[in-house]
Amino acid sequence: MKTYITLTIYLLYIVLLFNCKNEKQETVVYNKPNILFILSDDHTSQAWGIYGGILKDHVKNKNIKRLANEGVVLNNAFCTNSICSPSRASILTGQYSHINQVYTLREPLPDSHPNIAKTLGDNGYQTAVIGKWHLVKQPEGFQYFNVLPGQGRYWDPILKSKDNWKDGHDGSVGKVHKGFSTDVITDLTIQHLKQRDVSKPFFMMCNFKATHEPFEYPDRFKDLYNDIDIPEPQSLLDFGKGTGGRTFVGQKLENLEARWEEAYRRPNEFWTSYPGLPFEKEGLDSIGLRQKIYQKFVKDFMRCGATIDDNIGKLLDYLDEAGITDNTIVVYTADQGYFLGEHGFFDKRLIYEESLRMPFVIRYPKELKGGQRIDDIILNIDFAALLADYAGIEKPNYMQGESFRENLKGKPPKGWRKNMYYQYWLHEPKRPAHFGVRNDKYKLAYFYGKGLNKYGASKEDTPPTWEFYDLQKDPKELKNVINDTVHQSIIDTMKEEIKKLQSQYNVPSDVPHFE
């Protein structure tokens, strides 16, 4: 009898233990996948650690590697206009900037403009966006939103919701959330997911401010990299226009140091603050100064990026705890690339590889085999079409991009693009407006140098110039070979490809043409 009672108690204990373990897990009652779309700002591929490069052994990337090992990595994902607001608009709409009307940094999406959140919401999804929005007007298509005003701030961020919305980048309205921005946005995302209707699939955008300038970080990472020197890019000591045939000055690292100086001297007047000031530079020549700027800049950038990796881990752990990992598509990407000292630059905007390239990883256990890499050319205008496809929705007519669902399984559709078209509109003399085309071997760019009356663009035109790079022989784009006769037939072919793509994507007629 004692044996029977003991066995009964033991079995009851096992049942209770199992139930306690699973009390937070959800029962999936819908047949469409959840979508968690994690979007960071400027977190460039050089700083992910899964794309190789000089920083791969230094970045903190445990959870990014986890996603890559469990999902599919895109080796050739590119943005179509490398700057924050336009790229975000293209991700949402599946359209080039000249179609969705977000060319620069202050334009909103037009009222009632279609986007993937609206499309998913109309097809049974709960839609939400938390974090950076940067599209001026109130988000449309998102049933719930809680977003930063403009760029927002890293510490104790203000977020705006339907209850306190005001158009623009005004941070005087909204609610203050104590803590570091990346941590706060993650916690709010998880909180919202816990409170949602579990009988419906969700589309959640978790948008980090990091790693945007000024590259701040929480105290837990302040000593990271203190005792080491970070390797330098090959072109760090490129000091200006004419180097390797480059036709413009660019955003030099010394301009970042000038911002540090101004922020330190006028903290109440400058537009932001930076960690780790003052920056001492006495006694340094131009080479020593640039090297020292680079070390501070890239260390701050990677410390800021470390918080993203931490919080990706928190999001993945939540999905596991809720029991919805298998039925949830997780995407992590950045809105564009970023220069980390290459060509002596910081910032983005250009058709050069570091700026053009978007890091991208996707996990969907039900369909995608982990640890795979895809070399096909994928654009940010394709992301919306992919999500619609996974949701069982025929691609809407408003989208210019294409679903790459089959590409992710190693089966690219017949006729998949071999060339991609890029156009940057926010003209200024040191970084002229330009368009171009890239394929797996070459890149051709036309710096037409006109603002075309776009918001914030300079009215000072620059002479039109061409740049051409052989990406197989010169992957770092150190030598513009536009005038090499050996390449002329290829250049002529690519010029025709530009015209073809401009026609295909309905590029406006006021964009400068060439013969």
Residue ranges of model-derived segments:
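Bacterial N-terminal signal peptides
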Residues: 8-16
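Formylglycine-dependent sulfatase
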Residues: 2-4, 8, 20-466, 475-496, ...
